[in-house]
């Protein structure tokens, strides 16, 4: 069978390869210490589960509107107005099958052959592939630990051409945990507004997972002008431990949302109906479940960051958000694929190679795991690195 050129340009997920290898080792009875999780290790809060159960009992099991249940679209718009200072109405919201789906819909609606999409690296691994599937061109802008892996206004300006259509902003970041300060957000907004046809999509899936009093500012809240150029991608997976529920959303100007809704209507159609009622409960009830989770992540973050920075040859910034640390391994002399493969084979510790995120001199550790695993993993990591000297 001859497949399309479009598909041939898409790179298979490196993370799936590592995960598959770790699972195979476990099947063989080998105990693997995994730091690969891209999801919280907490169960979905009971009140969210109960809301979905009630929806099932009430017969909310049929097809729904492709754009989402009206009550959920209203709840999301209210949240964006009151918590993020983004003046959206329900009509500006599209409920999608997870945050990833919201971005995929967006790329299909906005990007076509010849369009460039600016993506700072390290990046979430699906961004460039989505752009390629939409037949656009990803323009990768490399950042370093010196700027906390954040793109500067000067770098953004230098990357913009007459073909630039979209800038992808992810704060807090996967894989680095970096969070742009309000001043940095305002500076990026000012650059975007220098160019008439440039838009920004702000991926805010980790917005609730913040540390040390860090403030999250949505770029669309800076002023009315940048609001008109902003698209918001978000979801319920990370903040509410709802990764398997597959409920995300896109917020933007009405023509865009209508176009994305049309695309969704001819692909997946509506998100699981009763899952949407769980999402409503997540928004409309007290947020203590999020606070409890973040408290646990805070404790784990301290242990893993201190532990890694005490190992000769390794270093990592202290993340301000999400639940990842991005570890610089350059001094070991190994690239990220070699480092990850050897660490897994010899010391049974699974991490994600930075090559998956556009940074081959780093690896990503997730601390969405228990404290015992973190401590054991750090001990094995130190033993492994000592063999490289």
From Swiss-Prot:
<keyword id="KW-0808">Transferase</keyword>
<dbReference type="GO" id="GO:0005737">
    <property type="term" value="C:cytoplasm"/>
</dbReference>
<keyword id="KW-0963">Cytoplasm</keyword>
<dbReference type="InterPro" id="IPR004838">
    <property type="entry name" value="NHTrfase_class1_PyrdxlP-BS"/>
</dbReference>
<feature type="modified residue" description="N6-(pyridoxal phosphate)lysine">
    <location>
        <position position="238"/>
    </location>
</feature>
<keyword id="KW-0663">Pyridoxal phosphate</keyword>
<keyword id="KW-0032">Aminotransferase</keyword>
<dbReference type="GO" id="GO:0008483">
    <property type="term" value="F:transaminase activity"/>
</dbReference>
<dbReference type="GO" id="GO:0009058">
    <property type="term" value="P:biosynthetic process"/>
</dbReference>
<protein>
    <recommendedName>
        <fullName>Aspartate aminotransferase</fullName>
        <ecNumber>2.6.1.1</ecNumber>
    </recommendedName>
</protein>
<comment type="subunit">
    <text>Homodimer.</text>
</comment>
<comment type="similarity">
    <text>Belongs to the class-I pyridoxal-phosphate-dependent aminotransferase family.</text>
</comment>
<feature type="binding site">
    <location>
        <position position="174"/>
    </location>
    <ligand>
        <name>L-aspartate</name>
    </ligand>
</feature>
<dbReference type="InterPro" id="IPR015422">
    <property type="entry name" value="PyrdxlP-dep_Trfase_small"/>
</dbReference>
<dbReference type="GO" id="GO:0004069">
    <property type="term" value="F:L-aspartate:2-oxoglutarate aminotransferase activity"/>
</dbReference>
<feature type="binding site">
    <location>
        <position position="38"/>
    </location>
    <ligand>
        <name>L-aspartate</name>
    </ligand>
</feature>
<feature type="binding site">
    <location>
        <position position="364"/>
    </location>
    <ligand>
        <name>L-aspartate</name>
    </ligand>
</feature>
<feature type="binding site">
    <location>
        <position position="124"/>
    </location>
    <ligand>
        <name>L-aspartate</name>
    </ligand>
</feature>
<dbReference type="InterPro" id="IPR004839">
    <property type="entry name" value="Aminotransferase_I/II_large"/>
</dbReference>
<dbReference type="InterPro" id="IPR015424">
    <property type="entry name" value="PyrdxlP-dep_Trfase"/>
</dbReference>
<dbReference type="InterPro" id="IPR050596">
    <property type="entry name" value="AspAT/PAT-like"/>
</dbReference>
<comment type="function">
    <text>Catalyzes the reversible conversion of aspartate and 2-oxoglutarate to glutamate and oxaloacetate. Has very weak prephenate aminotransferase activity.</text>
</comment>
<dbReference type="GO" id="GO:0030170">
    <property type="term" value="F:pyridoxal phosphate binding"/>
</dbReference>
<dbReference type="GO" id="GO:0006520">
    <property type="term" value="P:amino acid metabolic process"/>
</dbReference>
<dbReference type="Pfam" id="PF00155">
    <property type="entry name" value="Aminotran_1_2"/>
</dbReference>
<dbReference type="InterPro" id="IPR015421">
    <property type="entry name" value="PyrdxlP-dep_Trfase_major"/>
</dbReference>
